[in-house]
UniProtKB/Swiss-Prot annotation:
Disulfide bonds join C31-C226, C73-C83, C88-C94, C142-C214, C147-C197, C155-C165, C169-C178, C179-C184. This is Osmotin-like protein OSML15. Belongs to the thaumatin family. It comes from Solanum commersonii. Keywords: Disulfide bond, Signal, Stress response.
Amino acid sequence: MSHLTTCLVFFLLAFVTYTNASGVFEVHNNCPYTVWAAATPIGGGRRLERGQSWWFWAPPGTKMARIWGRTNCNFDGAGRGWCQTGDCGGVLECKGWGKPPNTLAEYALNQFSNLDFWDISVIDGFNIPMSFGPTNPGPGKCHPIQCVANINGECPGSLRVPGGCNNPCTTFGGQQYCCTQGPCGPTDLSRFFKQRCPDAYSYPQDDPTSTFTCQSWTTDYKVMFCPYGSTHNETTNFPLEMPTSTLEVA
């Protein structure tokens, strides 16, 4: 077999393996405004107009991974700039986590018992309604979930910031809200989020009702910003002003 033929066979096998493996993530923007999607440690960042999608593949073993949306961004041709919510160090291609407030889709693939673990979290606050889950649902807690309440419009005054609703830990700090020194429970402020998004993490130890699992290798995943039926589907229902134009090139 020639070297060229060997390379071609290797490429075809790799392509078939990739296209048949789970772990493909689609990030779709259904909001009536531009969202600058972000994903770490796999993905980076992408500008999404309404109706646009972005796909990337996360390999088995990926963990502590996040997907979120950024709003009111301005980036130059080199991908440097700033976002009002979810900013990740002033770059389009995120390498680190975003600045609160930002609604999060979190996941870890192919962990113990060959399970994928995933969730929606508002521990870092809320900026955009979101749905997240498997494209091929399975038994138990392997089904899509969402957080679509009008949290920005109803946000307590102590947590309200431009473009979103901040989290109590960032705002006030301390064990009560941050749970950094041992067990902790819900607070009145975390209950504000939980009552509106019962499937989402509302404080760091909100595991029993907020962690979802799917069997590894059985499904891909989809994140949607402003899923159908959410309060942000139409501009008139979005409670915080969005810009009519931006300056970035992305």
